[in-house]
């Protein structure tokens, strides 16, 4: 005979799973942003080694467009600023989610101890 999970515990477990899923999605998005930021920094480093007024090419869709170094550098500096802001925002969200997860894990552990005292009632995320 299987034992039913108490509704209160079941609700908290669902919330815990949702928070974990949300954190995983956020970390994936943050990794994409951080990867793009590293790429932009690398390109800016390469551009800094070129003399002023140098002609460079950039890819726009399926086209290779001729432009000057300063224009590309300005575009990349703007992009870098946006990416850094997004990365900081994701970091704050990650910290908040991790705190919420810890709090909810404690609550779930308390409920497990309440409903299943013989098993010790602790889980790890």
Curated annotation (Swiss-Prot):
InterPro entries reported in the protein's UniProt record: PFD_beta-like, PfdB, Prefoldin
GO BP terms in the entry: chaperone-mediated protein complex assembly; protein folding
Keywords carried by this UniProt record: Chaperone, Cytoplasm
A cellular-component GO term for this protein: prefoldin complex
CDD domains associated with the record: Prefoldin_beta_GimC
A UniProt-annotated Pfam family: Prefoldin_2
Any one GO molecular-function label of the UniProt entry: protein-folding chaperone binding
Main location: cytoplasm
Cellular localisation: Cytoplasm
Domain of life the protein comes from: Archaea
Family stated for the protein in its record: Belongs to the prefoldin subunit beta family.
Assembly information from the UniProt record: Heterohexamer of two alpha and four beta subunits.
Function field: Molecular chaperone capable of stabilizing a range of proteins. Seems to fulfill an ATP-independent, HSP70-like function in archaeal de novo protein folding.
Database matches in PANTHER family: PREFOLDIN SUBUNIT 6
NCBIfam families named among the record's database cross-references: gimC_beta (TIGR02338)
Protein name: Prefoldin subunit beta
Gene designation per UniProt: pfdB
């Amino acid at each position: 005979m299987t034992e039913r999970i108490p509704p209160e515990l079941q609700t908290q477990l669902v919330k815990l799973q949702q928070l974990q899923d949300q954190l995983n999605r956020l970390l994936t998005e943050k990794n994409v942003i951080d990867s793009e930021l590293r790429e932009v920094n690398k390109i800016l480093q390469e551009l800094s080694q070129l003399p002023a007024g140098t002609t460079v090419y950039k890819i726009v869709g399926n086209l290779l467009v001729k432009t000057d170094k300063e224009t590309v550098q300005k575009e990349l500096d703007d992009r870098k600023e946006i990416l850094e802001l997004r990365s900081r925002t994701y970091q704050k969200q990650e910290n908040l989610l991790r705190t919420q997860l810890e709090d909810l894990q404690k609550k779930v552990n308390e409920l497990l101890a309440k409903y299943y005292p013989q098993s010790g009632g602790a889980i790890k995320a």
